[in-house]
């Protein structure tokens, strides 16, 4: 039987989607009206999603709350949290749900056929038959609820989405983004934040929430996607029988209307919060925003991505450089959102002054006029096109299955035209057209039409305001206090009872009967053998090469690693700056603009970074490398190596103006990253009180690095030559042949072809004096807190089990899954209201527990301290134990692209990890029993007794817990 024989479906279109090596089908389910798009191919990492068009009508976050709550139990699978049960007990390669401005999507992926079928069933039942209509507690837990524990206690608001969005709205970037869409689309859905504004989330009623669900969650409003190597006919028959045939077509009014263009540009101002003692100088965000066409235009869809690179994102791009030269902003960047009906292109200057708003706009317009008049740099256009095409062809999306990204790409057009899910995947022809257009005035005309003559635009200014967060907290506290005061004794009693009832609901586990309704694999379904390493040693001109014989589709992945273990701690801040600056300064043969363009024309990217590796065999030995990575088509290898050699051996650090621009840019981006990734920053900072690995992470990427960048910025203004000299000294010290190690990922033929080119580049490096001994370090304070302007916290507690005499075993990987999806999930997220909580036990002994967007502080630390008690009483039945084992294998066996396989092998080589050790740990996981987990209670207790904590977050919360800390300071 073929798809053509399925009477339940109408085939609207079928054709070969050659650019993604798939057979494409567009179907309509006749009875329900459901839309189905299929990409059938030989990829065993299968992907499914169901999406719904969900245009928000207000700022209460109802689409976001529904996304959270549909996955909290359903008719067929009535467990309280099937999402977590699947995370614990499936071999998924992706499992999540996402709320977009105009749609909500529920994707899953797996390489295991039965697992894939199970995931589809659970997700489809979740969206069509959720328990949200039966249990208001689900809405309260995930959305929002009043919390009152006693009649004399303070009335509060809690809820997972509520706290998530409090964290989001603490970020000026989030404030800017929401305000841009509000300014450009006042009359359609894009002016409303689908995630929810914390000020308005508590205005959402249970009834309005259910009405939104019933309105939009119907097959007639659905978009169903299947990708990969599967029996498509069987899946479609099952889909019809189990779900779609139960529904008749229903007219769903989910149409998104276009916003009519404006007669003139709109000017909007708003504010974001900084702490009371922060300076307001140079803290304003300025943006120049234009609506550009619609998302169904294949050429525009790609062309403005190229213009983003050519005009503002590439080093020395004309708009960026003009603004930087005028002293407007520390960081200037472009933004292009093509995933909505009317795409938006923006220029943004971060850390400017509000008084510069008019100048900001005039500089952009004058620069664009000059570009139109004289022509865009053709090399920049080609670089932008080649970069986009390389990324598309490589289809490397890190941990995400490429089929998922292809599917989400489909929705950029499919949502607005039922016949066009694949138009942005069939883009190689578009790239060819764009390449030809470089020699015409096509791009200049786009600038004139959409960026200069277009009145559908806005200028949004986001200013800092001291204590705005505190003002809002105080206003909310007063509002809640007044509300409580207006209540009768009976109403207060009801609030207390509701709070207690919700806690009891949260504490009551799902019944064993309900848990057994969830489909599950067995231990026998797990792959017995670990993925092998591929490390073959070779030597070229006395330089060791570790090659990884892996098929890489004609792309060479090469890393040059330089021993940096003898760099003093005082040099690490400069090394971090050096890492960020390399490739962005001019060289002997290239200006920094030409270098960036050539890199993107001839390679898939040249990147620099540092890599820290513990030596498993010798705990006192620490492998610290400076790493230069490049990816390149075999035919362009010589050019790629020439560009890399220029970067490493002839970078010019005497242009202190350029160094100043880079320092300001790094500082601005760190300010955003320290808050947005506060959980990881806090964990590393906490571990830096005892771990060399974490200390280096902090010095090169974290809080210590931010402090170093601030000092370097000051030094550049006072003694610029000293900074230039230090960077030049780092290059001279670091880039020596005797420090070099090369990693090569590609097949044997590719390596043999590359050897002459590698030898040629090696010969260009001098041999220097011997590498010195590992540097001494001074660890940070064990108990620290860092204050920012957010309304939530990131709470970390860390320790080291190897220092306490314990050994790493595979059971620790299992424990991580158990804690993440059971104890921590229930206590920190479900009961505590935090958006997330995670834990890790590294092979080198470092361990952490950390929360994400957490309304609590000391309560979360108490939860961590009770972990050993939980482990001691851990007594699951065989089914639950198997579930945890399957979830652990899911993380172990995530599919990898060639580059990731090479990196995994190289890490094992540097750390001294043998395949036998990995296999032993795998066996320990596969054969684990509850007593193996209980034995880890003392290990975890030893970790927690280290009592190393770090909190990043709200000033008032930190001050209330000041006794916990030895050091409290501002984050930024």
Feature names for model-found ranges:
Residues 1-47:
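Non-catalytic terminal extensions that flank enzyme cores
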Residues 40-42, 49-51, 162, 166-171, ...:
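His/Glu-based metal-binding/catalytic segments typifying zinc-dependent metallopeptidases
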Residues 45-55, 81-129, 136-147, 174-199, ...:
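M16 family metallopeptidases and their MPP-like homologs
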Residues 62, 66-70, 578:
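Active-site His/Glu-centered metal-binding helix of metallohydrolases
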Residues 72-73, 196, 200-222:
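A conserved hydrophobic secondary-structure block that centers on an alpha-helix together
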Residues 94, 210-214, 273-276, 319, ...:
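Generic recognition of flexible, low-complexity loop/linker segments
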Residues 158, 210-242, 723-758:
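Non-catalytic, conformational "gating/processing" segments within enzyme and secreted inhibitor domains
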Residues 432, 445-533, 671, 680, ...:
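Long, compositionally biased intrinsically disordered regions
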